[in-house]
Amino acid sequence: MSVSLSKGQGVSLKKNEYDLSSVTIGLGWDINEEKKGFLGGIFGKKEEEYDLDVIAFLCNSAGKVTDLGNVENGKPTLVNGDIIFFNSLRHKSGNIWLTGDNRTGAGDGDDEQIIVRLNSLDAQYEKIVFIVQIYNGEKLQQHFGKVQNAFIRAVDARNIEMARFDLSGGPAFASQRSMVFAELIREATGWKLRAIGEPSESDSFVSHLRNYM
């Protein structure tokens, strides 16, 4: 039975209870529809499309990201390192990857997914942090206040939902454009999924990355 988490809560995903050979971390969301005028009242046309991205940081025992990817002109590019995002979809180990980029949130179920082979993940990785951002949110004046029915969930290799964290928007999130959504923490008997839900006004995951360096 899936465990529904509240902010700050965690649940153990034990190897003897679930198949952790391949775990799907799914993210989903809806955008509030705004009706304008007579035609808007008929069709309920969305005011705009939101592009939400999910990002994963692979951290060591100290909770830090140590590999920032390829270096160009003396600066790390974050590509082919320990960060999984839209410009670096697959980790070099082959044990964690992003399935694609949904730019609208349309449709039922997961809008974006990160697949993790937890049983095969190198021992040096003790934590995986999941960030959600609104791409170009500042430029487009978009924010989580209009994001509804947002969730992150963990599903094992047998398609059994193990845990879920639901987080809707609202006035309190009207200036927030990114969020530390959840994290996976390695335990002796498996992994723990912890719900965080800490928002930020920045629309870039890089602002969160600084806390893990």
From Swiss-Prot:
Tell me, what's a Pfam family for it?
TerD
| Organism domain of life | Bacteria
Q: Which InterPro entries match?
A: Stress/Tellurium_Resist (IPR051324), TerD (IPR003325)
Print the keywords alphabetically. Answer: Plasmid, Tellurium resistance
GO BP: any one term: response to tellurium ion
User: What is the protein's known function?
Assistant: Not known; seems to contribute to the tellurium resistance (Ter) mechanism. Also involved in phage inhibition (Phi) and colicin resistance (PacB).
User: PANTHER family given for it?
Assistant: CAMP-BINDING PROTEIN 1-RELATED, GENERAL STRESS PROTEIN 16U
Q: Which family does it belong to?
A: Belongs to the CAPAB/TerDEXZ family.
Q: What protein name does the entry list?
A: Tellurium resistance protein TerX
Organism (species): Serratia marcescens
